[in-house]
A protein has these predicted regions:
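Histidine/cysteine-enriched polar flanking segments
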Residues: 1-172
Length: 172
């Protein structure tokens, strides 16, 4: 296990790095359930069609959004079968869920990215994301995965581990 005192989050606290204004600024997130393992660049994960990923990335850039991968804490389900996707509107606190089995099904999310979040299919339900992307940042796996597991014990259906969201030094 990594030395917790030598990880980036601990070093950032020692240096008194400012946290205000250093997180990623996006209007929306496109969340795509994918069991992993996630490589350093999560969207290059095995099982994700590169052509579909390119279209998702282009669509998210158009609307000031970002695509991140999600999975349930501590559980690994089949890499195939029915999985979730969602568009989360950060500004309005709204979310719209969909499902995919084939990579082409994810293209529906491109249209949803442009929708008004006050429309049909959108809800105020919570989604709690905890970065656990250890190949991108060790802190996220070492500190994030236990946090996600503890939260999932209390908030069973709303907690997800996620790939790196951007903005470093926030690990628990």
């Amino acid at each position: 296990m990594a030395d917790l005192d030598d990880l980036c989050a601990a070093r950032a606290r020692e240096r008194s790095d400012p946290l205000i204004g250093t997180a990623l600024h996006v209007r929306r997130f496109l969340l795509v359930e994918h069991q992993g393992p996630w490589p350093f660049h999560a969207l290059e994960s095995e099982g994700l069609d590169p052509d579909v990923v390119a279209r998702l990335v282009a669509a998210t850039r158009e609307v000031g959004a970002r695509t991140i991968l999600i999975r349930r804490p501590g559980r690994r389900s089949e890499a195939s079968g029915r999985r979730a996707w969602a568009v989360a509107d950060v500004e309005n606190g709204r979310i719209r869920w969909g499902a995919w089995t084939d990579a082409a099904d994810l293209l529906e999310a491109c249209a949803v990215l442009r929708e008004d979040s006050g429309g049909p299919g959108w809800s105020d339900e919570a989604a709690v994301l905890v970065c656990a992307h250890g190949r991108h940042d060790t802190c996220c796996a070492v500190r994030g995965r236990p946090v996600a597991a503890a939260l999932a014990d209390r908030l069973v259906d709303v907690v997800w581990e996620c790939s790196h969201v951007g903005g470093d030094r926030f690990a628990a």
